[in-house]
Amino acid sequence: MAPIKVGINGFGRIGRIVFRNAVEHPDIEVVAVNDPFIETTYAAYMLKYDSSHGLFKGEVEVDGKDLVVNGKKVRFYTERNPADIKWSETGAEYVVESTGVFTTTEKAKAHLVGGAKKVIISAPSADAPMYVMGVNESDYDGSADVISNASCTTNCLAPLAKVINDNYGIVEGLMTTVHSYTATQKTVDGPSAKDWRGGRGAAQNIIPSSTGAAKAVGKVIPALNGKLTGMSIRVPTANVSVVDLTVRIEKGASYEEITETIKKAADGPLKGVLAYTGDDVVSSDMLGNTNSSIFDIKAGISLNKNFVKLVSWYDNEWGYSRRVLDLLAHVAKVDASK
């Protein structure tokens, strides 16, 4: 099977990490990138050097207005309007929408004007169908032109919640994600009219924040709709986050039994999405981990057989970006079978 030709709109954190992952992905070839705010030489620099993930494993060069990565030309566009990007010139049939701006179906559909067939939004969407690998990707039937890969936190939480709900039944639960700071936060205190706490210096503070990640699980696992909610605590680390899921379960089980159930799922149907560790790990040990969710056996606790706290790590950049591409490859496979 020939590689799936992909375009990336938005060359920020996720756009660049998706590109890096694509180089390692056997089914994907990035043939075009669009970003109106940077020129090609700067795009090459940002792809080559990364403070969290290190030096790019390969060759990055510039040829006129285009990138050349590992000897292959990657067309570089600088269009502000997605409808003006000529994806068809490069053969890009699938577009990763990673600007964080065009997150509705109507806005993301603009990519179809330039020749794209499908758009995968690398963020939650208010109206596009959301899919999480290992959870509900089998629901994709090829009919939607625009889909969402949900958020990095939902990708961590949903596989874990699925295993617990399938085996024990979740009555209700609360989630907290202890989340690294992101590009939307401030390096020092600055104006943030909609979120006053969010305007405080990211590297100086622990900042309580909101997240829709837990409620979004109800969209990908309808049986959990209304049973989960959560919050975020932004902390002074640049990458890697951790989910704390506290649930009341219907079918009583010891923490050890629950652990064995999670391990069985991680070694079986959810391999590559859900993983586990019994080591005394810290956040930096998870840097570059390609799994969506890494269950920390030693970090969790239970109060009794029906009330348990589970802890799971995720590289909110690398693991999530790999899932974007895995979902894209799955979508392309389903589309090809139609």
Swiss-Prot record:
InterPro entries: GlycerAld/Erythrose_P_DH, GlycerAld_3-P_DH_AS, GlycerAld_3-P_DH_cat, GlycerAld_3-P_DH_NAD(P)-bd, Glyceraldehyde-3-P_DH_1, NAD(P)-bd_dom_sf. GO terms for biological process: glucose metabolic process; glycolytic process. Belongs to the glyceraldehyde-3-phosphate dehydrogenase family. It catalyses: D-glyceraldehyde 3-phosphate + phosphate + NAD(+) = (2R)-3-phospho-glyceroyl phosphate + NADH + H(+). Its EC number is 1.2.1.12. This protein is a koningic acid (antibiotic)-sensitive GAPDH isozyme. It is present only when no antibiotic is produced. NAD(+) binds at residues 13-14, 35, 80, 316. Transmembrane segments: none annotated. It comes from the Eukaryota. This is Glyceraldehyde-3-phosphate dehydrogenase 2. D-glyceraldehyde 3-phosphate binds at residues 151-153, 182, 211-212, 234. The active site is at 152 (nucleophile). Homotetramer. Keywords: Cytoplasm, Glycolysis, NAD, Oxidoreductase.
